[in-house]
Curated annotation (Swiss-Prot):
Stated induction or repression of this protein's expression: Up-regulated in peripheral blood leukocytes in response to T-cell receptor stimulation.
Sequence segments annotated as region (Required for apoptosis induction): 151-274
Organism encoding this protein: Homo sapiens (Human)
PANTHER family, per the entry: PROLINE-RICH PROTEIN 7, VESICULAR, OVEREXPRESSED IN CANCER, PROSURVIVAL PROTEIN 1
Top-rank lineage group of the source organism: Eukaryota
Extent of motif PDZ-binding: 272-274
Major place of residence: membrane
Location of this chain's protein in the cell: Cell membrane; Postsynaptic cell membrane; Postsynaptic density membrane; Cytoplasm, Perinuclear region
Gene Ontology CC: cytosol; dendrite; glutamatergic synapse; nucleoplasm; nucleus; perinuclear region of cytoplasm; plasma membrane; postsynaptic density membrane
Biased composition (Basic residues): 90-102, 111-122
Assembly: Forms a complex with NMDA receptor zeta subunit GRIN1 and epsilon subunit GRIN2B. Interacts with GRIN1 and GRIN2B. The interaction with GRIN1 is reduced upon NMDA receptor activity. Found in a postsynaptic membrane complex with DLG4 and GRIN1. Interacts with DLG4 (via PDZ3 domain and to lesser degree via PDZ2 domain). Found in a complex with JUN and FBXW7. Interacts with JUN and FBXW7; the interaction inhibits ubiquitination-mediated JUN degradation promoting its phosphorylation and transcriptional activity. Interacts with SRC.
Protein name: Proline-rich protein 7
Transmembrane regions: 10-30
Amino acid sequence: MVMSQGTYTFLTCFAGFWLIWGLIVLLCCFCSFLRRRLKRRQEERLREQNLRALELEPLELEGSLAGSPPGLAPPQPPPHRSRLEAPAHAHSHPHVHVHPLLHHGPAQPHAHAHPHPHHHALPHPPPTHLSVPPRPWSYPRQAESDMSKPPCYEEAVLMAEPPPPYSEVLTDTRGLYRKIVTPFLSRRDSAEKQEQPPPSYKPLFLDRGYTSALHLPSAPRPAPPCPALCLQADRGRRVFPSWTDSELSSREPLEHGAWRLPVSIPLFGRTTAV
């Protein structure tokens, strides 16, 4: 069977295309293999350097605790010790300076003529730039979290007295979580709160009718002007008292007036909680 010129050309182009494509794929695979090998070598070098640094850190720490660290100048002696040594040397070798007019005896040799063999000058303090850098474990502890901010989820989980869940705050119908004096209660406050009997949440003056709480004026009085009315409302307490524990314990008898109601109306609201 004899192939025509067109068929031969087509097969040649087809085979050449796939050969070139295969060479390109092989070249890409070889390049990726080289890159991975170089990256592995770099990781091994970094791992060796980290291991050496970890091995040298205990030696440097021991040197700083025992004496001078390797490669650095000896540590500076404490100042109070040098101050104590100076008076001792002064007492052992007093420098007597007698005025020539008051001196009557024979001339005494100078005190510096025969210095003590063990008396040496104090070593100079090393420069500050050669001091040992602080270690990560020697850094001061971070300041405590700000108590005025709500805790994050991790802190709330680890707390001994975690805040109430968000579902409980949403389903609260008495407004207990609307007024928070402090963000976190201490153990003492919680113990005192447990010792106190729970307040009875019942409306006030329900045993009597509403007519007994309403005092109608015997004679009609003119209505106060608007500014006086606003000032009176501002000076007074809240129109609707809340159902918080702190206010129930110190609740006073309900004041009767035009702006007071005989029954406390709870206010619903949402607060941020975990």
